[in-house]
């Protein structure tokens, strides 16, 4: 089995160079994994999927911006009289949470989800970014690029090779859900990423969160209005 542990920089700095023997006192046992799920019923059983993660809340943009924006999107959707499509919204631990959720719900998700977004890093005001699904040609991809083109013509386009969040699981071979990402500055592309400086003073701003919220809201509105009239 593989193992490892975390320690603070101050603790690390006290260690001298050399070899260490490590004793890890741990056990393997059946536990539990908790996640939040909200299903909003629309006229159709076809679903738009929103996923965000809740596993490392000390970081403002890389973590808290997603749940914050998704919470307000859920509030807005529940205030609408009735949407054309249904909505599946989940708050999960990153990676293991999406794997767990897929293991329990994959068949239902595959039958119902036709569009969706993984919501991460939507709180800064430095850029707008787009990360495609593995397919790159889903309605989620087309809508994301269309919306961002009008918000910021200079938005950053990443490739599927730049993936690093739960889109890895949702778009994995054999799963292939139509999930893209609309972000502000992408994870790993700002200097405060995965440090204590990813906070409300240095990275996340009210304007940044508002921009992240409206980018995804406009994408949802575009999907709702995307109809063929006879």
Question: What is the role of each PLM region?
Answer:
Residues 1-230:
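N-terminal hydrophobic/helix-forming segments and targeting peptides
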């Amino acid at each position: 089995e593989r193992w490892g542990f975390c320690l603070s920089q101050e603790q690390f700095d006290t260690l001298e160079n050399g070899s260490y023997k490590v004793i890890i006192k741990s056990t393997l046992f059946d536990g539990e994994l908790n996640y939040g799920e909200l299903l909003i019923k629309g006229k159709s059983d076809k679903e738009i999927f929103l996923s965000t993660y809740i596993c490392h809340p000390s970081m403002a943009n890389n973590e808290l911006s997603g749940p914050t924006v998704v919470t307000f999107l859920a509030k807005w959707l529940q205030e609408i009289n009735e949407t054309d499509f249904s909505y599946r919204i989940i708050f999960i631990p990153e990676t293991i949470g999406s794997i767990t959720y897929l293991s329990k719900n994959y068949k239902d998700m595959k039958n119902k989800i036709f569009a969706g977004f993984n919501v991460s890093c939507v709180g800064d005001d430095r850029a707008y970014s787009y990360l495609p699904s593995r397919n790159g040609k889903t309605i989620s991809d087309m809508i994301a690029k269309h919306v961002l083109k009008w918000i910021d013509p200079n938005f950053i386009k990443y490739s599927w090779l730049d993936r690093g969040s739960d889109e890895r699981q949702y778009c994995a071979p054999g799963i292939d859900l139509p999930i893209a990402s609309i972000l502000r500055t992408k994870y790993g592309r700002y200097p405060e990423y995965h440090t204590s400086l990813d906070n409300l003073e240095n990275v996340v701003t009210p304007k940044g969160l508002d921009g992240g919220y409206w980018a995804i809201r406009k994408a949802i509105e575009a999907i709702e209005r995307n109809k063929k009239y006879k």
